[in-house]
């Protein structure tokens, strides 16, 4: 009998064990689609980014015009840029939904997979931040100035660190060139980390909506979930293409149509929508170092999720109190996102402070208390 190449070839068998014969729980829902959607986003971003890099010039005097040139004179340059800019938004939508799924269904108990995932989120945030600086518009320049300046809050070494990061005494040409280098490099780091993420995931297998072991009821990934992933791809690509073609600048800042000017500060400096929740937490603390620590904690708190799990059940499927708390957390993040886009004045300051407090309180205090209460109510 001839050997099956798919199962025996050194390279093909790796792909086979990851995408074809992978034993998968039979009951995973559409919430398990976001992993593959993130893979699709990453591939799209790397391809469009590579095409943009071919026409981009990382120099303060040429960056803005090189981007304008790409949009005006390069064949489909406008489309490539719009796909790349809006692809970032869809990347973050998918990763936030993916993390939300992980919290709801207790997927964070696969500790290695979860920790690599949080590192992936941090790398993605770094990539998006340095990428936003590259067009060298007003918001690019001032966003870079404000965010890099946060490092100066670190005691003793802060100022030196910031000047080392800038490559001078302000955000200037050296900053732009190194940010371009980072923006080119980091997506490949993300791709490498993704493989590690999947390697750890395939050690334990996927979790499922019931949060119970599913070894007794596994089905092959292909054709069942490969076709389901294709449906997910179509459902994401439709709004993505629609956004990129009909209103490509909807999520951008109009300030970025003005070339960077170190002598004129925009009236409201704010990051892209996907960073607004963290920006609101940063602004809600009147002390610089405190704000920076809260900003870091807002994302790093995810590392604590496995340690804060006290429930005897893995998933929230049969835990109505935890579910209510989870959806309050989601609403709270939406409020923080909205507050982050508003100016720093009376109602927004206090709303931001309350929402920031609620965010940390739910994750650090209320989730464990409510989980313990549910254990008691169910006599577990």
Curated annotation (Swiss-Prot):
InterPro entries: Cyt_b/b6_C (IPR005798), Cyt_b/b6_C_sf (IPR036150), Cyt_b/b6_N (IPR005797), Cytb/b6-like_sf (IPR027387), Cytochrome_b (IPR030689), Cytochrome_b_C_euk/bac (IPR048260), Cytochrome_b_N_euk/bac (IPR048259), Di-haem_cyt_TM (IPR016174). Its cofactor is heme b. It is found in: Mitochondrion inner membrane. Binds 2 heme b groups non-covalently. The keyword Heme applies. Gene3D superfamilies: Cytochrome Bc1 Complex, Chain C. It is a multi-pass membrane protein. This is Cytochrome b. The keyword Heme applies. The chain crosses the membrane at residues 34-54, 78-99, 114-134, 179-199, 227-247, 289-309, 321-341, 348-368. The gene is MT-CYB. PANTHER family: CYTOCHROME B. GO terms for molecular function: metal ion binding; ubiquinol-cytochrome-c reductase activity. Heme 1 (or BL or b562) is low-potential and absorbs at about 562 nm, and heme 2 (or BH or b566) is high-potential and absorbs at about 566 nm.
């Amino acid at each position: 009998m001839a050997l099956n190449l798919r199962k025996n070839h050194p390279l093909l068998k790796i792909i086979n064990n990851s995408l074809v014969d992978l034993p998968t729980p039979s009951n995973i829902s559409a919430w398990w689609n976001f992993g593959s959607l993130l893979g699709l986003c990453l591939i799209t971003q790397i391809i469009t980014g590579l095409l943009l890099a071919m026409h981009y010039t990382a120099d303060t005097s040429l960056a803005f015009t090189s981007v304008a040139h790409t949009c005006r004179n390069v064949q489909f340059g406008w489309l490539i840029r719009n796909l790349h800019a809006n692809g970032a938004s869809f990347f973050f939508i998918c990763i936030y939904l993916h993390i939300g799924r992980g919290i709801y269904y207790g997927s964070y108990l696969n500790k290695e997979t979860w920790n690599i995932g949080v590192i992936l989120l941090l790398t993605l945030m770094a990539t998006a931040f340095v990428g936003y600086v590259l067009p060298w518009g007003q918001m690019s320049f001032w966003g870079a100035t404000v965010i890099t300046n946060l490092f100066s809050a670190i005691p003793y070494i802060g100022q030196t660190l910031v000047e080392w990061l800038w490559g001078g005494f302000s955000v200037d040409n050296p900053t732009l060139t190194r940010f371009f280098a980072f923006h080119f490099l980091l997506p490949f780091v993300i791709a490498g980390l993704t493989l590690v993420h999947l390697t750890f995931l395939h050690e334990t297998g996927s979790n499922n909506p019931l949060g119970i072991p599913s070894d007794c009821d596994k089905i092959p990934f292909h054709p069942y979930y490969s076709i389901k992933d294709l449906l997910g791809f179509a459902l994401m690509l439709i709004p993505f293409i629609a956004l990129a073609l009909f209103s490509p600048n909807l999520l951008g800042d109009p300030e970025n149509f003005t070339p960077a000017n170190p002598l004129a500060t925009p009236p409201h400096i704010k990051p892209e929508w996907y960073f607004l929740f963290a920006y609101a937490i940063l602004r809600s603390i009147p002390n610089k170092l405190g704000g920076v620590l809260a900003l870091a904690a807002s994302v790093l708190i995810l590392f604590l999720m496995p340690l804060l799990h006290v429930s005897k059940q893995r998933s929230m499927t049969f835990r109505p109190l935890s579910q209510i708390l989870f959806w309050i957390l989601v609403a709270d993040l939406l409020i923080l996102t909205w507050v982050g886009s508003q100016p720093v004045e009376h109602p927004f300051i206090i709303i931001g402070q309350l929402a920031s407090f609620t965010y940390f309180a739910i994750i650090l205090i209320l989730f464990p208390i409510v989980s313990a209460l549910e254990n008691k109510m169910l006599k577990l």
